[in-house]
Amino acid sequence: MSEQQMDLKDLMPTKRKYMWKTAEDRRMSDLTCVLEWLERRQGKKKQAPEKQKPKVVTVLKRNKKKEEKKGKGLMTARGGNRRDTETSQQALGKRFRKDAASYRSLYGVEQKGKHLSMVPGSYIKDGPKKSDTDIKDAVDPESTQRPNPFRRQSIVLDPMLQEGTFNSQRATFIRDWSNKMPDMAYERKLKSLMEKSTEPKMETMRMLKPEEVLSCRYLRLSKENIRTLLKLCKDAGMNVDIHPHMVEEDIDAKKVFTGIPSMAL
């Protein structure tokens, strides 16, 4: 019985995994697990390319053999077309050389060994440096070839030249103005005639009769207007039955004008 008890005790764990471990122990155990996993992963990565290398080499060797066989077959089949291909290649090479030469001459590309430099010849360090006199000589013909027509008058230093240019301009301006003067006068006359013909003729204002004034529906008579009407009627010798306090609706032309209605004021 004692032996069986001892065996059972050996089988049972003396520690529980999570109860007696501190936080530091747990952290360290996690770190060790992570490190082991990383080592395993790196070892797998290193082994993978080593295993794949011989396969690639064998595949390349097979492809090379196939290409060599194909090339031999093509050479035997296209034996008669070799000369045509060579002539076409020579023509292409000549054309390419011509294009390269024209490109260099246009854009200033100079050849240095195998490489081409895009820097123009005037800015290359190894090239011959131009002196100040050469630069001035190159600038002078450009300035003479391209005269600026919009140059300011202040650039001319000699006052006599300035006076001559101004006098010539004045003379040309006066000539043009004198030639245009009769045309301008003629145009003014034409404009005045056209305006006179288009102007509406002013008609003489016709004096309204009191009957017409009072029979207007939309007329609002003020006190002053009614007074003036009364004066006009009295001056004309008409007896008018109207007073300033009357409303427009109360005014009736037939009752107001009992005398001669056709008589003008």
From Swiss-Prot:
Coiled-coil stretches noted in the UniProt entry, renumbered to this chain: none
Organism listed in the record: Homo sapiens
Protein name: Uncharacterized protein C16orf78
GO cellular component, one term: nucleus
Biased composition (Basic and acidic residues): 126-139
Region (Disordered): 62-94, 118-149
